[in-house]
Amino acid sequence: MSKKTIFAILLILSVLIIIRPKEETLLRCAMFGPMKLFSSDTCMAYFNVFGYSENVYQDLRENFDVASLLSLSPERKYYFAQLYLDNGNDINKKIDQGMPIHSAILKDDLEEFYWLLEKNADPSVVDHLTDLDAYDFIDIMIIKQPTPNRLEMHKVLERYKPSS
């Protein structure tokens, strides 16, 4: 790393320490974008250097869920969703905006779908918005709006489906 880069990082961290924004503010900056003085990357640098306090984990637990974190920008969504799960939060917890696996199916996001299954999302959990599990939901989505991604999701879910 060049001396200029090291100096810039130290300067940014010094300003962060001097003005001391709350960690919750820095978390939102890192997740959603810039705040008055700092870019999202600068806020991420703070956490990369100092780590996450219990306040940050509590903020994540109380104000976010996997589905909302997976709606962040592509470069941040898996990072924060994993941080949420690493703190012991349940990927299969029923939430107001629906189950994350249903959201991935609806968004036609194959990468997110695979990520959720890898993290033990349970396709048999019934989503309270649709009153369907992921198996039935994918069947309906294929009828209403078939896509190559949804056809792939259907194949994958057929392998997960418990035999009757």
What would you call each of these model-derived segments?
Residues 132-164:
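Extracytoplasmic/periplasmic C-terminal soluble domains
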Residues 49-54, 80-91, 114-123, 153-163:
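Ankyrin repeat domain, specifically the short helix-to-loop turn at the C-terminus of the second helix
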Residues 6-12, 122, 135, 139, ...:
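Low-complexity, intrinsically disordered short peptide segments enriched in small/polar/basic residues
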Residues 24-72, 93-103, 126-142:
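Ankyrin-repeat boundary/"N-cap" motif
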Residues 87, 102-105:
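Long amphipathic alpha-helical segments
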Residues 3-22:
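Hydrophobic membrane-insertion alpha-helices, especially the h-region
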